[in-house]
Amino acid sequence: MGSKINPIGFRLGVNRDWEAKWYAARGYKETLNEDLRIRKFLDEKLKDASVSTVEIERAANRVNIAIHTARPGMVIGKGGAEVEALNKEINALTNKQVHINIVEIKKPDLEAKLVADGIARQLEARIAFRRASRQAAQRSMRAGAKGIKVQIAGRLNGADIARREWHTEGSVPLHTLRADIDYAWVNAFTTYGEIGVKVWINRGEILPGRKNQPAKRSKGGKK
């Protein structure tokens, strides 16, 4: 089953955390739809800002949003103008107090979402799919990845019949729960139709910390 299930959902609670952290006793549907509107708005507004992950936390009437991006300057803007504008627009969208935190991604070549976005943009620019996937995989391996797997599916090179092509380097153990596997899928819109890009990146193993050992009890009894 490790090969079929979403590897991020498979590892939730093990070495991955939820991207939305809130609890709603009532109005769950409205809160979830509000989350989806926020994510859709940020996807459209920051499509060129190399955003990998958006985390949303809620407390009372406050919404905390953490934007993980490889281009923090583009999101923040000159003197913080862009992030202030984002804050106001999301505030108007939700009617809640919004706080935005920008988190810089140090190694974008180890983020599956950014790698998949890069491959999709190259496919839309009519670059050969094998070249795009091979170069992306090589950059990820040079950045420190233990393994990477890329799947591209659709009418590749304008072929009449859609097919699926893979490129794999290193090791990507989908069944190993302690393996830090990042996963993303993106659609590329070409003149021949829609092409799907999926990327799995193995960033190594996350070993659980040792739990505190209980103090050893001394044996009772008289000497």
Curated annotation (Swiss-Prot):
It comes from the Bacteria. Keywords: Ribonucleoprotein, Ribosomal protein, RNA-binding, rRNA-binding. Gene3D superfamilies: 3.30.300.20, Ribosomal protein S3, C-terminal domain (3.30.1140.32). GO terms for cellular component: cytosolic small ribosomal subunit. This is Small ribosomal subunit protein uS3. The keyword Repeat does not apply. One of its GO terms (molecular function) is mRNA binding. GO terms for biological process: translation. Belongs to the universal ribosomal protein uS3 family. It comes from Lactobacillus delbrueckii subsp. bulgaricus (strain ATCC 11842 / DSM 20081 / BCRC 10696 / JCM 1002 / NBRC 13953 / NCIMB 11778 / NCTC 12712 / WDCM 00102 / Lb 14). Binds the lower part of the 30S subunit head. Binds mRNA in the 70S ribosome, positioning it for translation. The keyword Signal does not apply. Residues 38-106 form the KH type-2 domain. Part of the 30S ribosomal subunit. Forms a tight complex with proteins S10 and S14. Pfam families: KH_2, Ribosomal_S3_C.
